[in-house]
Amino acid sequence: MCSRRRFNRSVFRSLILITLDKYFIFYCCSWLLIRYTRKLHFPIPLLNNWLTDFVFVPLIAHVAFVLGSLIFTTGGTFKYPIYQILSISLLTALVFEGFLPYYTHYNTADFYDVLAYFAGGVFYYAVHQNHTSKKIRKAFERKLSLSK
């Protein structure tokens, strides 16, 4: 008999295993590296300007993709269409490059940041989403073979 505790533990374990992949770890580590070098007043020139913007959209899309795959679909067959990922990029650009520069001193309106948001979205669509979808599908197939 399956207890609630065992079910919650298996869902949590699955969420961690699917979420933490090489791309997600790269996004988080690069963001931490850029924030750390900014804090030390020793920014890395090219990376400081656009890497955090590049990884922001894939980071958000990946977390939403994993949660959506675990909650709403079975087998990892779901994938975001390109227009949804570009919509995420557009909304991110509007908020961080359109509205927030008028209300905060930290944000600046920069066209290259907008390009970085869209490049990150295209990267997620072309590379990372396929990687994660295959990973979820394999885990689902493994689970089906174990239950037989």
Residue ranges of model-derived segments:
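Bulky hydrophobic segments
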Residues: 7-148
